[in-house]
Amino acid sequence: MEQVVIVDAIRTPMGRSKGGAFRNVRAEDLSAHLMRSLLARNPALEAAALDDIYWGCVQQTLEQGFNIARNAALLAEVPHSVPAVTVNRLCGSSMQALHDAARMIMTGDAQACLVGGVEHMGHVPMSHGVDFHPGLSRNVAKAAGMMGLTTEMLARMHGISREMQDAFAARSHARAWAATQSGAFKNEIIPTGGHDADGVLKQFNYDEVIRPETTVEALATLRPAFDPVSGTVTAGTSSALSDGAAAMLVMSESRARELGLKPRARVRSMAVVGCDPSIMGYGPVPASKLALKKAGLSASDIGVFEMNEAFAAQILPCIKDLGLMEQIDEKINLNGGAIALGHPLGCSGARISTTLLNLMEHKDVQFGLATMCIGLGQGIATVFERV
């Protein structure tokens, strides 16, 4: 079986969905920009040698519809002979895109793939056109489709207080801002054209979603966003609404070395699981445990984790049940997470994996794990190993 390696990984800056940098930039353009950039950064690989493109996107309608992967590839002037497919596993879409490409390479059906994902939540809102079947309520709670309420349930079940949530959210912004100031994101962010507040076209090379002024005291003043009577989850402890894309160049190890391309990491194991939709945010726990089992590792073997911060009240129970509460500041989301950077649904899996690779190199650790919860009760995880 072929070894699957990540040769390169990049992303756009994360733009605010409300009147942000990419308010006049389409999702296909964000995607095409990264496809072109990955190929330009790795000239040893000819675009025509790509076997497939796997691109995650959740709201596949309007500008994100009709197979955005192919539309973006055509815009990027990828040769017409290279196919492309759009992948949808809700929040886990671009990580699923990575898994799909990895399996193709493992079986010998592909040697080189572009993977990634995009979501322009400013142009195509998360709830656009959603119409749940009324019969679902016979099998799952009606609130299972409301992510904020499922998070309130997790918080109550695991004793996650409002104070714990506010502290974690403030940490996310502080760490993301520190990473920005230190240049930690420089190797992953590709400058991307957008418009500033005055409408002037400019290149953005930073995440405009981060709020460096965030404090626990300010967060404590916010009202509950989903359960106004007894809730603890606020807008400030939820992932920000943002627009962005991320991409990775995935190859067989033999092809990468043949072309003289240096692999950054191997895909050691992959896992996807289902869980109760009423506590959809708990999915990273069984997904991570399964991925670790497949890799023959334990949580203590992992040097750094990237866990998507859908909500502070969602990630904290996962950290607790993976036995990592005492290691948050040494291992978990060291450059902040989605509370500060946002969670453009189809982009996030590739985004957290990209950040993880850079952290693994910076911290000089052998193993890293990226994981995320998925709406309606799923979890996905990937274990990476430095080469």
From Swiss-Prot:
Subcellular location, principal: cytoplasm
Catalytic reactions of this protein: an acyl-CoA + acetyl-CoA = a 3-oxoacyl-CoA + CoA
Example of a GO cellular component annotation carried by this entry: cytoplasm
Any GO molecular function: acetyl-CoA C-acyltransferase activity
Cellular compartment(s): Cytoplasm
GO biological process: fatty acid beta-oxidation; phenylacetate catabolic process
Gene3D superfamilies, per the entry: 3.40.47.10
Domain of life: Bacteria
EC number: 2.3.1.16
Enzyme class, first EC level, given as a word: transferase
Coiled-coil ranges per UniProt: none
Active site: C91 (acyl-thioester intermediate), H343 (proton acceptor), C373 (proton acceptor)
UniProt entry keywords in alphabetical sequence: Acyltransferase, Cytoplasm, Fatty acid metabolism, Lipid degradation, Lipid metabolism, Transferase
Pathway membership: Lipid metabolism; fatty acid beta-oxidation
Cited NCBIfam families: AcCoA-C-Actrans (TIGR01930), fadA (TIGR02445), PRK08947.1 (NF006510)
Subunit structure: Heterotetramer of two alpha chains (FadB) and two beta chains (FadA).
Family the entry assigns: Belongs to the thiolase-like superfamily. Thiolase family.
Chain's role: Catalyzes the final step of fatty acid oxidation in which acetyl-CoA is released and the CoA ester of a fatty acid two carbons shorter is formed.
Name of this chain's protein: 3-ketoacyl-CoA thiolase
Organism, as annotated: Escherichia coli (strain UTI89 / UPEC)
Gene that this sequence comes from: fadA
